[in-house]
Amino acid sequence: MSTNNSVLVLKVGGALLQCEMGMARLMDTAAAMIANGQQVLMVHGGGCLVDEQLAANGMETVKLEGLRVTPPEQMPIIAGALAGTSNKILQGAATKAGIVSVGMSLADGNTVSAKIKDERLGLVGEVSPKDATYLKFILSQGWMPICSSIAMMDDGQMLNVNADQAATVLAKLVGGKLVLLSDVSGVLDGKGQLIPSLTGQQIAELVKQGVIEKGMKVKVEAALEVAQWMGQAVQVASWRDASQLVALAKGEAVGTQIQP
């Protein structure tokens, strides 16, 4: 068994759900790590599925600075696409790889506190760590939590939370190592080349230049926040090469390291 007690928090984007081979490779890698004693927590988005479901219902997708605007009438569809379909697709892939998983959302187990992030965004939530008991129990059994980014306020109102921010908060809660996985190999410079390491100052400069924008801006800023909070680098890497995860579990650098 591995002596690595740190939880590996893997955030996966919606694009993964549309790539069966990518999902299978990622889950096989996660299964091997869990068998070796590594605790793994997966957090997911599902933007592609949400867009499809909204379009099927004649509703428009609007984004503000890389974040999805969530009007009240869209909330049931978004919750269904994320906490329902997306979550179960990933759970199915985990089961196929021999992983015992628990499908959950941010609303479960008193795990986080949630509030409205910005009135302009509608029912978009901002969450903060609350109670790790539920997650720690699941992880202690050798099971893998697969968490969607649907949260709930104290009055029962569902909120849509950006999945990168959700992963950041859960990494804080369990004191884990955060890896933000997308369909790109990391943060790319203006010429499309991978940047191996970035500091907060360099990120601010690249945002100013428009090199880092939209979804990647949200991702990198979430990574920087948790890197600073935990005093350790956060990785932004690709799920397309799941073998990178094994290197990461061994403490090797992959993708772009966001420095605290």
UniProtKB/Swiss-Prot annotation:
Any one Gene Ontology cellular component term annotated for this protein:
cytoplasm
Please name the GO terms of the biological process aspect recorded for this protein, alphabetically.
arginine biosynthetic process via ornithine; L-arginine biosynthetic process
Which residues make up the annotated site Transition state stabilizer? 11, 219
For this protein, the record's Pfam families field holds:
AA_kinase
Name the top EC class: transferase
Annotated residues that bind substrate are located at: 46-47, 68, 160
User: Catalyzes what?
Assistant: N-acetyl-L-glutamate + ATP = N-acetyl-L-glutamyl 5-phosphate + ADP
Identify the EC number(s). Answer: 2.7.2.8
Asked if the Swiss-Prot or TrEMBL record annotates the protein with the keyword Ribonucleoprotein, the reply is no
Q: What is its main location?
A: cytoplasm
Q: What's an example of a GO molecular-function annotation for this chain?
A: acetylglutamate kinase activity
From which residue to which does the signal peptide run? Answer: none
Q: Would the keyword Magnesium be found if you checked this record's keyword annotation? A: no
Keywords carried by this UniProt record: Amino-acid biosynthesis, Arginine biosynthesis, ATP-binding, Cytoplasm, Kinase, Nucleotide-binding, Transferase
Q: Which InterPro entries match?
A: AceGlu_kinase-like_sf, AcgluKinase_fam, ArgB, Asp/Glu/Uridylate_kinase
Q: This protein's superkingdom?
A: Bacteria
The record's section on NCBIfam families has: argB (TIGR00761)
Tell me its family: Belongs to the acetylglutamate kinase family. ArgB subfamily.
HAMAP family reported for this sequence? ArgB
What is the protein name given in its UniProt record?
Answer: Acetylglutamate kinase
Source organism: Shewanella sp. (strain MR-7)
What is this protein's gene name? Answer: argB
